[in-house]
């Protein structure tokens, strides 16, 4: 009967979230979780917009993009924001259907985005051909291939083994732990100034705060869900979507700001509708 009523048929994903299925529309399994996923995409698209500006009307942004091109980090940033945007699209497909094939469309971009963040944090420091060891230079050369292989192996594994969410959770968790650890090591080693005087630290702390609240929302819903809600009228998984999108946006801004200051550029925060982004300008020496 459910196959006849619901457009996508019976959900076959091993995970069902708190929001009740097909309550608002027979075409969308989890209505609020579906549309909140596009907030993640919106943050990715906004980040791409900031990197694509070629208008001289906004001189600060125009110069910022020019500096990014000179430092040869613009392509990395564009790819990071593109992968973040795809996470939102994949998540929307998944929550709209709760089909396993679309769950993979959600999980593959998550792995790709997290691995891209690891790549970014490991490549803030430029390779020093004179002083860096041969082992380090070899690692930097093969780093993209190592991370790509990791993502491919995990993708193949979760495609074959359907009923074991722990595989994705542990694999993705390892990338997130790596991001946290590497970011901590970088800030401890290179960012000695207090947080109020350090723009990279500000972005990193904004990222941590967003991700922390997002995780609390996710965990609370998983543990305390009752009849489709924890708090009546509030979908905490939708809050998770919005804040993880924001955290991803801020992490990339942390990377950009760190690169700019590493190369001697000054930075400032630009606030637009409550969202901060960086602008790089003149050399500080």
UniProtKB/Swiss-Prot annotation:
Pfam families in the cross-refs: Ceramidase
Glycan-modified residues: 131
Membrane in keyword set: yes
Enzyme Commission (EC) number: 3.5.1.-
Gene Ontology MF annotations: N-acylsphingosine amidohydrolase activity
Keyword Glycosyltransferase carried by entry: no
Compartments, record wording: Membrane
Membrane topology: Multi-pass membrane protein
Source species, domain of life: Eukaryota
GO biological process assignments: ceramide metabolic process
Top-level EC class: hydrolase
Protein name: Putative alkaline ceramidase dcd3B
Organism placement in taxonomy: Eukaryota, Amoebozoa, Evosea, Eumycetozoa, Dictyostelia
């Amino acid at each position: 009967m459910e196959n006849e009523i619901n457009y996508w048929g019976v959900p076959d994903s091993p995970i069902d979230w708190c929001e009740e299925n097909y309550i608002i529309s027979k075409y969308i399994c989890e209505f609020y979780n579906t549309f909140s996923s596009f907030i993640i995409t919106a943050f990715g698209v906004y980040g791409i917009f900031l990197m694509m500006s070629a208008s001289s009307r906004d001189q600060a942004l125009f110069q910022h993009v020019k500096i990014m091109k000179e430092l040869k980090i613009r392509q990395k940033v564009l790819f990071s924001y593109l992968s973040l945007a795809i996470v939102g699209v994949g998540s929307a497909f998944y929550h709209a259907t709760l089909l396993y094939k679309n769950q993979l469309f959600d999980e593959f971009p998550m792995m790709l985005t997290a691995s891209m963040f690891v790549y970014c944090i490991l490549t803030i420091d430029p390779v020093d051909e004179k002083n860096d060891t041969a082992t380090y230079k070899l690692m930097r050369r093969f780093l993209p291939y190592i991370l790509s292989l990791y993502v491919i192996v995990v993708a193949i594994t979760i495609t074959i083994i359907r009923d074991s969410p722990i595989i994705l959770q542990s694999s993705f968790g390892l990338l997130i732990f790596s991001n946290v650890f590497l970011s901590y090591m970088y800030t401890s080693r290179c960012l000695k100034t207090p947080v109020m005087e350090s723009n990279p630290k500000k972005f990193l702390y904004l990222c941590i705060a967003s991700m922390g609240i997002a995780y609390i929302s996710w965990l609370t819903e998983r543990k305390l869900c009752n009849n489709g809600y924890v708090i009546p009228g509030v979908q905490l998984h939708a809050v998770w979507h919005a804040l993880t999108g924001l955290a991803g946006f801020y992490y990339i801004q942390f990377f950009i700001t760190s690169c700019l200051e590493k190369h001697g550029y000054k930075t400032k925060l630009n606030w637009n509708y409550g969202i901060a982004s960086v602008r790089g300008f003149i050399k500080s020496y």
